[in-house]
Structures are given as C-alpha cells and as structure tokens.
Amino acid sequence: MEAEDYNASYEDYPDDVDPIVVLEELSPLEGRVVRILLVAVYSVICLLGILGNGLVIVMITCKMKRTVNTVWFLNLAVADFLFNVFLPVHIAYAALDYHWVFGTAMCKISNFLLIHNMFTSVFLLTVISFDRCVSVLLPVWSQNHRSVRLAYTACLVIWVLAFFLSSPSLVFRDTARLHGKISCFNNFSLSAAVSSPWPAHPQVDPVGSGRHKVVTITRFLCGFLVPGLITTACYLTIVYKLQRSRLAKTKKPFKIILTIIVTFFLCWCPYHAFYLLELRRGSVPPSVFSLGVPLATAIAIANSCMNPILYVFMGQDFKKFRVALFSRLVNALSEDTGHSSYPSHRSFTKMSSMNERETGML
C-alpha cells in the first residue's frame, strides 16, 4: 500500500460528499491495521447475523405458533438478515483497500439497506414498546383488539415508512474515481463526480450542503431521538403502573425486549454522534474522524447480529446452559401468557410461580 493512498483528508472534501476512505491522519501501517480489523469484525458480524437471524426466521415460520410477538421478532430478524446478506460487499470494499468494484447500483443498494435496517429496527422496537405499554395500561382492550392481523398491518406501514426515509441513499449515493480507486460516497450536490469529486480547492455547494444537513438531521430525529423518547416514555409508564399494581417484584419483567432496545440505542448512538459532528467538520479535528467513523459504523452494524444472541442467553436463566439452543429460542420468542392480566393479584401469584421461560418475553 503506497503512501499516496492516504493523501486525502476531510479538509479536501466538499460538504456534500461523505467518502469512506482511510484518512491521512492514519499512517500506512495504521490504515492497514484498521482495514484488517474492519474486515475481521464485519466477517464475524456477517456470519453471526446470517446464521442467527436465519435460524430465528426458520424457527418462527416453521416451528412456532403465529402470535403478535412472533410477528414483531420475525420482522426484526428479516430486516437484519437482509442487511447481513449484503454485508460481504462492504467486507470486500475494505479488503480491496476501499476500491469499489460492484458498480453504482450496488453502492446505492448496500447503503440503502444499512439505513433501512436502522429505521425498520427502531420503528419496530418503538411499536413493541407501545404495544407493551398498552397491554399494561389497557389489558382488557388489548386482549380484545391485539391481533396478529393488526401486527402485520403495523409492520407493513413500518417497512413502507422505512423505505421512504431511506430513499435518499438511492438518490445521493454515487461512485467516483479518486487516486486510481473507485469510491462509494454520498454525492449530495448530484454533481458529475466521475472524474474528480474532491478537487484540491473545492467550492462549497450550498444546495449539496443543505441536503447533507437535512438527511443527517432527519435520520437522527426519526431514527434515534424521537423513537428513543417514545420508548423511554412507554417504559417509564410501564414501571410506574407495575409499581402501583404491586407487581414490581415480577420476575425480570420485559427483560428481553428492554435489553434489545437498550442494545440498539447503544449501538447506533456513536454513529449518529459522528455524523452530526461531521456537519461541523471545520470545528472538529480531522483526527477525530479517522478512527471514530469506522469504529462507530462497525458498532452500528454489529447490532444486526445481536438480537439472536440476546434471545438465546436471556430466554432462560443463563446458568441453565444445558438447555437446548432451539428450546431457548422458542422460549424467548414465545408470546407472554400473562400480558393482559397485570392489574390482577391472582395473575401476579400465577406469574410469580411461572417458569422463567413463560415470563421471559414480557
């Protein structure tokens, strides 16, 4: 790897592009180490994501009764699985020293799937939180109206909305040649970027810069902040209701879905933080992005393989590891049997005596 491969920096780029390259603040050796680590991490994520989410999809579609909960988790698994299927192109991109050989269409599709996965997952988790909240606050109404058909309808709306919010990737993602390599990047100005998208002394395009800000802030608000606030409000309401109903001692209530939600926001928080910082690139040292952006992206991508792992290790007491893997998945994904009976003291007595596998998916 020659030194000239690292002669680009964030100061060289107009505000309307978002290249994925190794920056000059990294030495050739450091850049090679980062690239190897990314290839290794992405490969592990891809393998775990395809196998884990694929297993969840098979288990739900072939082995389990269709319930509202299984509909939620089936859609989560499908969204993660689709992204992981296309993750090898990102692995190859890093392995080829950031030389994109898959064409402009795949450049658009691969980034679209990453953003679509983010929106689909966060919207599903938000709806699940709202569903749990309604089940606690209005158990009778929930028992009468909470149906598989309604869950499928909600999922359809979520997928369509996620497609709409992810569509900027299909418009602005582009490829261009730089230093003898083809890069996959965001061309928010929609300028002809075939020859040189990053001139030595670029003129900031106000239109492209404005689009960049709108897309970044929209993703942060719709894909992180607003869902996070709604989810937090739902679970604060649930905790308050359970405490007033003397159910605070219920055995680890909502532990799996709550852990999945917390994991999602922890994984995506660095990603949004760095892309918001990128809007103020001039006031942030370029070295901050050199390792921060690749690391934040890797952490965000890792979320796509986390859910099956959480299902397995939290479906039952982890100490009982002798329990078969398939049993753990079924127990974790099964419909909770007592969601509509929270206010009842009799249900509390019953729930307290239930096996962990019966309450694990609350």
Curated annotation (Swiss-Prot):
Record's GO cellular component terms: plasma membrane
Attached carbohydrates are found at N7, N187
Gene3D superfamilies with a match to the protein in the record: Rhodopsin 7-helix transmembrane proteins
Q: Where exactly are the transmembrane stretches of this chain?
A: 38-58, 71-91, 109-129, 152-172, 220-240, 256-276, 282-302
Q: Which domain of life is it from?
A: Eukaryota
Subcellular localization is given as: Cell membrane
Q: Which GO terms describe its biological process?
A: chemotaxis; complement receptor mediated signaling pathway; G protein-coupled receptor signaling pathway; inflammatory response; negative regulation of interleukin-12 production; negative regulation of NF-kappaB transcription factor activity; phospholipase C-activating G protein-coupled receptor signaling pathway; positive regulation of cold-induced thermogenesis
- GO molecular function list: adipokinetic hormone binding; adipokinetic hormone receptor activity; complement receptor activity; G protein-coupled receptor activity
Q: Where is the composition biased (Polar residues)?
A: 339-354
Tissue expression, as annotated, is: Widely expressed in several tissues including adipose, muscle, liver and brain.
The family database entries (SUPFAM superfamilies) matched by this protein are listed as:
Family A G protein-coupled receptor-like (SSF81321)
Sites of Phosphothreonine modification: T337
Q: What membrane topology does this protein have?
A: Multi-pass membrane protein
Broad class of the protein's primary localization:
membrane
Which residues lie toward the Extracellular compartment? 1-37, 92-108, 173-219, 277-281
What protein name does the entry list? Chemerin-like receptor 1
Give residue spans on the Cytoplasmic membrane side. 59-70, 130-151, 241-255, 303-362
Q: Give disulfide pairs as residue numbers.
A: C107-C184
Q: Enumerate the UniProt keywords alphabetically.
A: Cell membrane, Disulfide bond, G-protein coupled receptor, Glycoprotein, Membrane, Phosphoprotein, Receptor, Transducer, Transmembrane, Transmembrane helix
Please list where the region (Disordered) is annotated: 336-362
Report the family membership. Belongs to the chemokine-like receptor (CMKLR) family.
Q: Which CDD domains match?
A: 7tmA_CMKLR1
For the modification Phosphoserine, the affected residues are S334, S344, S347, S353
Q: What does this protein do?
A: Receptor for the chemoattractant adipokine chemerin/RARRES2 and for the omega-3 fatty acid derived molecule resolvin E1. Interaction with RARRES2 initiates activation of G proteins G(i)/G(o) and beta-arrestin pathways inducing cellular responses via second messenger pathways such as intracellular calcium mobilization, phosphorylation of MAP kinases MAPK1/MAPK3 (ERK1/2), TYRO3, MAPK14/P38MAPK and PI3K leading to multifunctional effects, like, reduction of immune responses, enhancing of adipogenesis and angionesis.
